[in-house]
């Protein structure tokens, strides 16, 4: 039986919860500990700091995804001479941003997402029994939010607004999801996007005003790098548009198809503890 040492306390709370669930599923013993304990463990995971792995030829190392949004020279300190290390990014687009930089150093980069809590975020009402509509707003231009609210008004919709930057209570969000007919997403780049995935897990169809580039984040200094708000998505989840001019037509299609979407199925097939756990098992196996 393998065991894992998890170092550092910078792990995102949702990642931590998902990681523990996966390790339990795989029957891998684990401990949140210190670099001085490496000798006692088979697999070492550090989400946010480099470790010189050249000192530990017989261990397996997993790093990321919390080093930084963009490639960082911190990775140079990993020194993967034994080919026993891997860096993880939660989605394809975020991996692609790192790849050109990481090619210069001997460190494989793999797409690995953390699971959604499908037990907590699960529906208990059919869509026809739900009556709420919400907007999830995160780091986009406030003018765009006003355009959406104005559009809703014309459709006689009064949406609940969850503003990521202003913070909100997760229990309120969960309560809304359980009672939501649909949600509208106004978000910038997401490499994982837990709040969106949690809505899908509650079987809430989503209408997404998506981004194409990172500089669409409000007041950001990012370059025009390709990205998305919904890295985990297929046609069962809802509809996507990119420009306010497309909203009316996309909304019409979305409402017509509202009862046909199956977002929870998508989550169960791609982001459940079991599915992500299998990917973790493969990730570990593939480290030499």
Model-predicted regions and their roles:
Residues 1-55, 278-283, 288:
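N-terminal pre-catalytic "stem/leader" segment of glycosyltransferase-like enzymes
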Residues 42-72, 86-89:
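Active-site proximal beta-strand in glycosyltransferases
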Residues 76-85:
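A conserved, positively charged/aromatic
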Residues 84-107, 142-144:
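A short, active-site helix/loop in glycosyltransferases that binds the activated sugar's phosphate group
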Residues 97-100, 116-173:
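Conserved catalytic-core segment of nucleotide-activated headgroup transferases in glycan assembly
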Residues 169-180, 201:
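Short acidic alpha-helix that forms the nucleotide-activated donor recognition element
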Residues 178-191:
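Acidic donor-binding loop of glycosyltransferase active sites
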Residues 191-270:
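Catalytic binding pocket for nucleotide-activated donors in carbohydrate/polymer assembly enzymes
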